[in-house]
Amino acid sequence: MADLLLGVNIDHIATLRNARGTIYPDPVQAAFIAEQAGADGITVHLREDRRHITDRDVRILRQTIQTRMNLEMAVTDEMVDIACDIKPHFCCLVPEKRQEVTTEGGLDVAGQVDKMTLAVGRLADVGILVSLFIDADFRQIDAAVAAGAPYIEIHTGAYADASTVLERQAELMRIAKAATYAAGKGLKVNAGHGLTYHNVQPIAALPEMHELNIGHAIIGQAVMTGLAAAVTDMKVLMREARR
């Protein structure tokens, strides 16, 4: 079985920065640290409202990321234009609503095949590999094939949010069947959304999975595992100032 890749989403480094309108913490530095720690790629979502990652972030990250850059974006002319200019290695096309806290579901590719085909084609023409963020649904998988996308990313939110063991097992089975179906259609299969240190392994064990994109859980864990060192460093500086 091939190695499973990890794409680290660093959006919430930018969320923390923007909460105070400062220049830190820096997503560019976070990307470097993640890569040094073994991340196989860096994912950022340039939202239409620019609530976390900014255009400037995207441009600098494209120049500095040493692995692979995956740009998540809505299917709009503006975003496709930006992607065609910056040329990330990958683009993941996602649905987007201004009021949502995070992406709430998969793209309805089947309901807008012509629009998706046009976007996928424009991105592919400049050498960008395209993934479509969809629910674990055979109809959407068929539509992704029709649109010409080489990759899909299966939305794992329902699996992550399941409130009982039986619900989670049912969602896992749905994802597993979708992954097998998609791989049989020649698609590369990624997955993401809501994956944590407690629920990732059953998804990671699915043999068709090529890459998992995980962000919030990793950034949250980083706060916890790095908090002691950060407090110690600050205390050292304060003590040194009084010497």
Curated annotation (Swiss-Prot):
Function, in words: Catalyzes the complicated ring closure reaction between the two acyclic compounds 1-deoxy-D-xylulose-5-phosphate (DXP) and 3-amino-2-oxopropyl phosphate (1-amino-acetone-3-phosphate or AAP) to form pyridoxine 5'-phosphate (PNP) and inorganic phosphate.
- Where's it found, cell-wise? Cytoplasm
Q: What are the binding positions for 3-amino-2-oxopropyl phosphate in this chain?
A: N9, R20, G194, G215, H216
| Active-site residue numbers | H45 (proton acceptor), E72 (proton acceptor), H193 (proton donor)
Instruction: Please give the biological process terms from Gene Ontology that the record holds.
Output: pyridoxine biosynthetic process
Which GO molecular function annotations are given, in alphabetical order? pyridoxine 5'-phosphate synthase activity
Give the matching InterPro entries: Aldolase_TIM, PyrdxlP_synth_PdxJ, Pyridoxine-5'_phos_synth
Supply one GO CC term from the record: cytosol
Keywords attached to this Swiss-Prot or TrEMBL record, sorted alphabetically, are: Cytoplasm, Pyridoxine biosynthesis, Transferase
| Catalytic activities | 3-amino-2-oxopropyl phosphate + 1-deoxy-D-xylulose 5-phosphate = pyridoxine 5'-phosphate + phosphate + 2 H2O + H(+)
According to its UniProt record, the EC number is 2.6.99.2
Query: Gene for this protein?
Result: pdxJ
Q: Which family does it belong to?
A: Belongs to the PNP synthase family.
Spell out the protein name for this chain: Pyridoxine 5'-phosphate synthase
What is the enzyme's main class?
A: transferase
**Amino-acid positions noted as binding 1-deoxy-D-xylulose 5-phosphate in the UniProt annotation, renumbered to this chain:** D11, H12, R47, H52, T102
